[in-house]
């Protein structure tokens, strides 16, 4: 017969002494107590019988409460308990509030059983301790005058977590009062009077109804149309749906206390939110950042910083580097600049970028930094700087093998392997997975098939908001090649199907469903106009190769052209961009000194490291332990040869 282990043990707090008291086995008791339900109301309910009765009445009565406790199934399918906060009625029996709707309470899905305790203490103990139960119990801790008795167990609870909505009264609306006195009263004479008061032929139906016959005793402004209020004003049921962000500059110490070091200045980065023809491209920085920079030139201290931080000197050095970079390349992605700007002056880069560049928040150049005065819509030479976003699907990333193949992103500050240029690991060449999947077009043409498509591109006469200077078909070709090769590489396959790549390069239509039935379709959409008099495609024309012919002759399955191979292209979500670029916050931290800034950057780099224990090697785990406990890591390294997966034990 197996021996049962104790449910709990009581032991002394470990100290430095070698002799410790042996652990004491705790006494175990069975609580044979009644189970009772609990109703947590957002009301001030007293112990008086009338107060409890009123609370139950606001919930629809005791039967409604019982029905709510008996509900089963997922919380989404429960009807819940309706709590009417303003269930008042007027003297005529009608509702006081228009469309008064209740707050819905539902059963807690995870039942955490609570024990109700009856605490007995000598009379007058509470008054001696300022009516504090906690202090009263503490004062009787060492005496035998305190008695605690378990009474019952709460195992079923209904809570009201929704917000109460705004409630509306229509007492001061004449048309509402007339409607209420007629239809609301259900009196025939009132009905008849109301109907007769409405003109048969309204010569001015657009006028306020208050200007007609209805209750002329009340003056109503012509702007008050007396429209019925919306049935619900608050569109959010729970007060938790907000994008909370912790202070990125707050550091938590070992004792758990969070501390914010340094001061903060605003970078005043200029954004352009519209791509219409009327949009004027900025030619200089925000007036406030220009003013601050002029003050810094005179005083040698940037406003909001301290002189010993040397922020202005670092800013001047950063500006010199960025001006040279923007002279060579007018449009940049910030992550590319992170590897070029030296670590010691990197903290000034947001201010420097605000002084020499602006940003689009939409369109083909979104989230890039563009030199002031440069309008990428003005010339096709800026087509190569358009951005494309790619993403590995979650179903692939759930595989440990794929996770291991995907490269770790670079730290916040790093050193480019190309001095003064974009790190080669940001470029897509079909031979390795790039660090960052927000790719500019000119970083894709290192792949031969994409280069072939790019060099045969016929640009549009005018850039548009969706595809920029490119025709949609050309962008689709590039995207399909990237998605196919990217999906192969993350799965460890670097041998591509040449027939698939050939098909992608010679695609005639954006989608197979867009094959036109006539030759008058739009130019630039890959329309096959090479048809004879009967409308049949001329199969002898080599330049117009049928996609079906490629599939059948070269063994490409019918659905392969729709397979993204585990990689997708889409609009970037805001959260991903904020986490990756870290440049959407207008507030910039200014370190107290240069040394403080270097320490902060190192801490950020450590936080950015991604560590997965399922795919990490023995050495990776040892290195991780060494950061916390070097001595233990050294012992494990010398005594162990490796770890065994728990599934193999």
From Swiss-Prot:
Keyword DNA-binding: yes
Locus of motif Nuclear localization signal: 296-300
Location of region: Disordered: 1-21, 556-612
Region 2 X repeats, Pro-rich: start-end pairs: 221-419
Summary of the function given for this chain in its UniProt record: TFIIIC mediates tRNA and 5S RNA gene activation by binding to intragenic promoter elements. Upstream of the transcription start site, TFIIIC assembles the initiation complex TFIIIB-TFIIIC-tDNA, which is sufficient for RNA polymerase III recruitment and function. Part of the tauA domain of TFIIIC that binds boxA DNA promoter sites of tRNA and similar genes. Participates in the interconnection of tauA with tauB via its contacts with TFC3 and TFC6. Serves as a scaffold critical for tauA-DNA spatial configuration and tauB-DNA stability.
Stored PANTHER family: GENERAL TRANSCRIPTION FACTOR 3C POLYPEPTIDE 5, GENERAL TRANSCRIPTION FACTOR IIIC, POLYPEPTIDE 5
Subunit and interaction comment: Component of the TFIIIC complex composed of TFC1, TFC3, TFC4, TFC6, TFC7 and TFC8. The subunits are organized in two globular domains, tauA and tauB, connected by a proteolysis-sensitive and flexible linker. Interacts with TFC3, TFC4 and TFC6.
Protein name: Transcription factor tau 95 kDa subunit
Gene: TFC1
